[in-house]
């Protein structure tokens, strides 16, 4: 069958307004004014994540995220929550491989309040021994609930990095080791804040029913007097590509059935031209009943109970930096040998590499991806977080509008070429077996 020709996908690109400015202390600000509903999302992204943790302090980025909710210069321990929720808003934070973020979604009348709250903890966070001890216990309990006492806990995002990577920054447990967490000190936390939570290491992103000029004025008022600090140079975390297959077995006493994760390293996400074909490939293989692996393994062979594919350890391909993996995750019955699953994956990748896409397959895939993306950025929170990560990692919040066009530019030949690089010889395979290790 000849390769499918590139055809035009009839999808539109959004045209959200994006305005920007930078304060003298280095804080970058991006604003999307949208008067369609009286709400606002305020997000602050700090350029520090799990990869930046020092050796002996695994999980520290996540621990510090918790500390940022324990009070600040003008606010007591629970007052950040009280002010946001008392105004009908919601808030949260999360730690990722390459960044940590915090956000509020509020009625637009409370925009200045949200900015004040974020500025107050950027200026000074309440790092005390009591707060540190309390949050170490909270994080340890999270690990017990989400990893240690849950079937497939941490699989594969915590389990495969030590096999896929060799450097500590890329391979360590970003959720945290109990011994490392318990040995954390107030001095560690204060040093972490001083080093990574500087204004020049952050992006403030605002989307909603606001006037951009007013947001900039409030930002100057509340953030402008935070002293500038030296911003750490982000090191290169890249490491040599695997030259042979890496394989290991993980045992899970709580898992009811086996699973396997297969990972490959992909090109640097900074170059979207070479990276996006892999993002599209993951969708071709695993998104929906008509996708290659779902159709083959779930419907035809019935060799699996679920199949997933994504880029980045946490499943969002657009907030990943180099190095990052292409991951396939398959859950299957004990009656299906893991080598049967792996052979099927290899066969489907080889078929795609040799025969290419079928007519219309790329169009359908891009249309689904674009529709899903447009739904995500339809909300003010989706827009604020998308602008923030694009500005932080690519210096271009305007990719908010440009991404659908970049997806449309991906060709069938590029997807075919990407499939050809995912060979068994360079795969990292982590098999999960139910039960305790013998």
Describe these PLM feature segments.
Residues 2-6, 166, 174, 199, ...:
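An aromatic/glycine/proline-enriched structural segment found at the starts
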Residues 2-11, 203-205, 331, 352, ...:
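C-terminal regions of mature proteins
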Residues 5-38:
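N- or domain-start disorder-to-order transition segments that initiate the globular core
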Residues 26, 34-84, 272-285, 294-297:
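Active/ligand-binding-proximal structured segments within catalytic/core domains
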Residues 26, 44, 62, 84, ...:
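Buried hydrophobic packing residues in well-ordered domains
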Residues 46, 72-73, 77-192, 347, ...:
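Acidic/histidine-enriched segments that form metal/cofactor-coordinating
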Residues 141-159, 238-257, 299-310, 355-401, ...:
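Short acidic/His-enriched helical or mixed secondary-structure segments at domain edges of catalytic enzymes
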Residues 261-263, 286-331:
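A structural supersecondary motif
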